[in-house]
Amino acid sequence: MINKKNIERPDWTKLIKHKKIDLTKNVHHDHILNEKIKEIIANTGFLVNYANDSDLYIAICNYYKIPIERTAIGFGATDLIHRVLNSIDIDCLYIVNPTFMMVDVYCKMIGIKYKFIELNEIENLKEVNKSGIYFVNPNGVNGEAHDIKKYREKFKWFIVDEVYSDFYDSYSLINEISDNTVIIKSLSKSLGFAGLRVGFCYGSTDLINE
């Protein structure tokens, strides 16, 4: 039972300083709801533990029509980004703004040199054939989507975060994969599975086996 004494719901009509909510996060500040969810989870065995992942692999690969041997599932897109960056050998990672805020954090943790750039700067980059580039396309921050495949041969690794592509797939590369391309997707946005932490990446068999 939840003790409701000294608990008040926030007044959402008032501006609260330093509470930033954007489209790249799935957060809320309703502590009553948080406690209720904890109570439900504590009293049920439903959706508490991860099951065997073979059915999930089959379901994802059948839905997106991609080969299972080139697919890896993970605990959301964040986990997969970290794993991909741990598995590739590059001189530098160019991160196209606006971007997911954890990419540079992982670069620091792993020891990868990185640089933030704008989309219109890519064509002028020189000698980047030993480097990688990271896009969020479509972009959940500014709502833009671009045809980026023309930049693919310029880089050693071409990493595309397509967590929003189920909403707009005109520029998705999931059906135009190449050996240097990595597609990262999440089920948290289109299916609302943020709490379950489910994502997958699609790339070369060598990378997936890493």
Predicted features, each with a name:
Residues 87-108, 113, 120, 126:
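Conserved PLP-anchoring active-site segment centered on the Schiff-base-forming lysine
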Residues 54, 68-93:
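Conserved beta-loop-alpha segment that forms the PLP phosphate-binding cup at the N-terminus of a helix
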Residues 182-210:
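Conserved core segment of the aminotransferase class I/II
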Residues 117-168:
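Active-site phosphate-binding strand-loop segment of PLP-dependent enzymes
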Residues 1-50:
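N-terminal "arm"/small-domain region of PLP-dependent enzymes with the aminotransferase-like
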